[in-house]
Amino acid sequence: MEKLVVLVVDDEEGIRSGISRILNNFRVGFPFLEDDFEYDIHEVGTGEDALDFIKNNKTDIMLLDNKLPGIYGIDVLEYLNKNKFDIQVMMITSYSSLELAVKATQNGAFNFVPKPFTPQELKSAMESITKHLFLKRMTNKMTQDDKELRHQFL
């Protein structure tokens, strides 16, 4: 079973712990794979702590609130985009606006889930982002394998 590292960034501890509880035993699988994906979940309460975490830990998926003390979530997202971190980001915020959704999408957010959300909505969004991440990595590996194969024949 492959574990994906998930960072939950929200200033509300209740939201963070609720997300962790929902995803703790949740698995995502493909019919053609033997093993499912599961999550290794970490929580932080500020944008600064999120940046510290990703600089020191491999992170696959980030669930990111926008309204954070200090650095806002959209600023964290811009940092990830500017510095080319390979992290799939799902924005989770109760302060949603069309402008924020557009800016988040332009900066690479995969999904935008407004709070409050149900456990099923969160699981569905996580299934989607996990499958997207798997397919993206598979495509990148195939592209790399193709380049190596071409190089061998040159």
Task: Label each PLM-derived region with a short phrase.
Residues 13-42:
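Two-component/phosphorelay signaling modules centered on CheY-like receiver
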Residues 10, 65, 93:
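Active-site residues of response regulator receiver
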Residues 133-154:
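CheY-like receiver
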Residues 35-61:
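Acidic, metal-coordinating helix/loop segments flanking the phosphotransfer/catalytic sites
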Residues 25-28, 52, 74-85:
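Short amphipathic alpha-helix used as the core "switch/output" element in two-component signaling
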Residues 46, 72-75, 96:
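Acidic catalytic/metal-coordinating carboxylates
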Residues 99, 117-126:
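C-terminal output helix
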